[in-house]
């Protein structure tokens, strides 16, 4: 794009408004007459067209310099970031009006149609200039907001990342702490030379709160410079200084503490309290809401943290314990089941004659005979009467328990005396009226 030159009202004096049209006609038509000394060549009357006549009327109009100036400002607004403001065009309009009044020139011509066209063209360019100004302001506002957002994000990332150069990094905190600790030495204060250039006042305190000299300054090159301060010029309490020091150190280490809390690792004291409650109530490890509140008050945790811990503990602590106990001692459970109180499943009339300490046989309805090698002690007081189905189930359980213990023993017996079905020791379980 060709660079446009800044135009002003004086760029279009009288007698030169038709120069552009003349030059264009000269390039297109070599037979056209050369321009005169003033740069205006009157075209032949017979060769003019209606369009050429309209162009000449526009170029000769008194408002044409103002229209050209406004068009130039619109082009300048679109070419660079620093656009032309509408206020500057208002000043140009005032200057144009003063010049026209000073020279006694009219603002309009004899053709009302041309006057209306020029006024509307100036209004359109004026609106266009205002819109360009708004767009320029929006662009500047967006750029400023975007840059501010980037700066904020970069600063926050620098603080959170804990880089060595950031002021809140652990290395920087240790350096600050050591530097502050060094300032409390009775021999003097060791500070960088840049601190004095910034106008910072550094002081050394000893017991009593009085400032004493000397003040030792160490330059970055390692040179030691001593500066004297008169005793008693500044007084400060050691307690206040120590309190301020503790506050500064707590602020510096605040990020470390917050990061530890964000990890989700509960304090050891809290886990010990909740673990103790869990094993004390292992039979029913489900705390009530009141118990949760009490535990939360003891451990300084929230109800949500306490609830989540117990959910995880039941799944990760108690469940593996139960699984391991079930897999290691399967036979122990069978033996402990026999130690339960023996429940009799036949009437008292049969049990009174069946309680004999001898080997006996149990005859089932199918006719199968099973020999019980170990005598079973019976207590008449604990006998209970049930249906034949319950008795059959109890007999099957006893048979299975005895068979698992004596797998190597033959069920027919080695020389054992088998009792007759009608013997009192043989218990015949039938669906009779006495069992109901």
From Swiss-Prot:
Its main location: nucleus. It comes from the Eukaryota. Keywords: Activator, DNA-binding, Homeobox, Nucleus, Phosphoprotein, Transcription, Transcription regulation. Residues 24-49, 401-436 are annotated as: Disordered. GO terms for biological process: angiogenesis; camera-type eye development; erythrocyte differentiation; positive regulation of transcription by RNA polymerase II; T cell differentiation. Residues 80-163 form the MEIS N-terminal domain. Residues 259-321 bind DNA. One of its GO terms (molecular function) is DNA-binding transcription factor activity, RNA polymerase II-specific. The modification Phosphoserine is found at residues 33, 41. InterPro entries: HD (IPR001356), Homeodomain-like_sf (IPR009057), KN_HD (IPR008422), PKNOX/Meis_N (IPR032453), TALE_homeobox (IPR050224). Signal peptide: none annotated. The keyword Kinase does not apply. It is found in: Nucleus. Interacts with MN1. Activates transcription in the presence of PBX1A and HOXA1. Belongs to the TALE/MEIS homeobox family. PANTHER family: HOMEOBOX PROTEIN TRANSCRIPTION FACTORS. This is Homeobox protein PKNOX1. It comes from Bos taurus. The gene is PKNOX1.
């Amino acid at each position: 794009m060709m660079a446009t030159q800044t135009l002003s009202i004086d760029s279009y004096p009288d007698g030169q408004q038709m120069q552009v049209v003349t030059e264009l006609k000269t390039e297109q038509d070599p037979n056209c007459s050369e321009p005169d000394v003033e740069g205006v060549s009157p075209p032949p009357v017979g060769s003019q067209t209606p369009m050429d006549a309209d162009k000449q009327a526009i170029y000769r109009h008194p408002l044409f310099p103002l229209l050209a100036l406004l068009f130039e400002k619109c082009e300048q607004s679109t070419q660079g970031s620093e656009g032309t403001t509408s206020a500057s065009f208002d000043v140009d309009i005032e200057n144009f009006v003063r010049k026209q009044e000073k020279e006694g020139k009219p603002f309009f011509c004899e053709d009302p149609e041309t006057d209306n066209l020029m006024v509307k063209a100036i209004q359109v360019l004026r609106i266009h200039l205002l819109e360009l100004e708004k767009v320029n302001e929006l662009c500047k506002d967006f750029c400023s907001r975007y840059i501010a957002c980037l700066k904020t994000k970069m600063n926050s990332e620098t603080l959170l990342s804990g880089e060595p150069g950031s002021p809140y990094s652990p290395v920087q905190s240790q350096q600050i702490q050591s530097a502050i600790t060094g300032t409390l030495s009775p021999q003097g204060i060791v500070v960088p030379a840049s601190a004095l250039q910034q106008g910072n006042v550094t002081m050394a305190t000893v017991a009593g709160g009085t400032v004493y000299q000397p003040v030792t300054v160490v330059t970055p090159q390692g040179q030691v410079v001593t500066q004297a301060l008169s005793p008693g010029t500044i007084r400060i309490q050691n307690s206040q200084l120590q309190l301020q020091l503790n506050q500064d150190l707590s602020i510096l280490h605040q990020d470390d503490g917050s990061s530890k809390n964000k990890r989700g690792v509960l304090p050891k004291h809290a886990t010990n309290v909740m673990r103790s409650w869990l094993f004390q109530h292992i039979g029913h490890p489900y705390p009530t809401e009141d118990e949760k509140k009490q535990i939360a008050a003891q451990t300084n945790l929230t109800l949500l943290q306490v609830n989540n811990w117990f959910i995880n503990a039941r799944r990760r602590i108690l469940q593996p314990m139960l699984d391991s106990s079930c897999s290691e001692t399967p036979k122990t459970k069978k033996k402990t089941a026999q130690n339960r109180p023996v429940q009799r499943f036949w009437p008292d009339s049969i049990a009174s004659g069946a309680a004999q300490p001898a080997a006996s046989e149990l005859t089932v309805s199918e006719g199968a005979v099973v020999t019980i090698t170990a005598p079973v002690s019976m207590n008449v007081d604990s006998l209970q009467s049930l249906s034949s189905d319950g008795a059959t189930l109890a007999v099957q359980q006893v048979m299975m328990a005895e068979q698992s213990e004596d797998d190597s023993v033959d069920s027919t017996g080695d020389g054992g005396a088998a009792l007759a079905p009608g013997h009192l020791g043989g218990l015949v379980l039938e669906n009779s009226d006495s069992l109901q």
